[in-house]
A protein has these predicted regions:
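Metal-cofactor-binding active-site regions of metalloenzymes
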Residues: 1-320
């Protein structure tokens, strides 16, 4: 799935149609793909993919009983294999949902991942997606008033899976991250008690509406530490906007980032395409690197934007 070079100006519809709710449903009307029809496909790559998909569904195939999600994971791994990527993390909110969704997803993951790793050599691991705000843009969408507490309770259970390696606070950045302090504190406590390698990722500073969210995200984690507990693995998704880095407050933020060892994850294509970055000269990455802040670049969902690591590296080269 690619969107060419489109810029998404209506973020609400972007959420509805392209991201959260673009969940495939298996068609009841199957296409009878005969060899003569396949040979008429003009695109060589598509023809090759169709042949592989049909092969995956043959009687002797280990993938013949794959669910739609398992097929997606398989093809994601195959694409990463082509790009030379060995390890990838994906966020999924089903892992934070009460009852059947989390259980069903774990069952599917545990069933398919050994087969995927054997074929491709690609390790896919998962972050538990926790929405920073409940969804209200979908008609009849019902969200519990205690959804954050429910998410944390589920997190403690599913985090036992070897395929689950962290948590990720996601969603449109329209609220102060301090609102999530209780949930962050519970995750930090879990890390201290159960799994020191568990990651906390918080999306912050993606737009310029709440410039204190990057600092507050780090402080929410730091202030949640138990006595003598070390700073856990903490990543900030985007970190594009914060207080002015030329001010005393900005310099203190740079020192805080360095001292706590947080990793700032940049996604240039995503920032541009979601209209969050219109002037490349205002990007803070040079200041971060000059102050020894840990930075890493990603695609923020390469399937949606049609980019790969090479294109993102070229964009970064042009920026630097």
């Amino acid at each position: 799935m690619k969107d060419g070079q489109a810029v998404f100006t209506n973020l609400e519809k972007c959420y509805i149609y392209r991201y959260i709710f673009a969940k495939g449903i298996e068609s009841q009307k199957k296409i009878n793909l005969k060899e003569e029809l396949i040979n008429k496909i003009p695109e060589i790559d598509i023809k090759k993919y169709v042949c592989q998909m049909l092969k995956d569904k043959t009687t002797n195939s280990i993938y013949k009983n794959n669910t739609l999600r398992q097929d997606k994971l398989l093809w994601i791994a195959r694409e990463y294999q082509k790009q030379g990527i060995k390890y990838v993390e994906m966020t999924d909110t089903d892992l934070a949902k009460n009852g059947e969704p989390a259980i069903k997803m774990l069952e599917e993951i545990h069933s398919i991942m050994p087969l995927i790793e054997k074929e491709t050599g690609v390790q896919i691991r998962f972050l538990i997606g926790i929405r920073r705000i409940p969804l209200t843009i979908i008609k009849d969408q019902k969200t519990s008033n205690t959804y954050l507490r429910e998410n944390i309770n589920v997190l403690r259970a599913v985090a036992k899976s070897p395929y689950v390696v962290g948590s990720d606070f996601i969603g449109e950045e329209i609220n102060d991250i301090s609102d999530l302090q209780p949930a962050i504190k519970e995750i930090v406590r879990y890390i201290n008690e159960e799994d020191k390698d568990f990651t906390i990722r918080i999306h912050a500073g993606e737009n310029d509406s709440l410039r204190n969210n990057v600092r507050k995200s780090i402080m929410c984690v730091k202030e949640s530490l138990e006595k003598e507990q070390e700073m856990p693995r903490c990543r900030i998704g985007h970190g594009l906007y914060s207080e002015d880095l030329n001010t005393e407050s900005g310099k203190e933020l740079l020192k805080l980032m360095k001292d706590t060892g947080v990793v700032i994850e940049f996604q240039l294509t995503s920032n541009v395409r979601l209209n969050n970055l219109t002037d490349l000269s205002s990007h803070p990455i040079k200041r971060y690197l000059a102050n020894n802040v840990n930075c890493v670049q990603g695609t923020d969902g390469c399937g949606f934007y049609g980019t790969d690591c090479m294109e993102e590296q070229m964009a970064l080269t042009n920026l630097l």
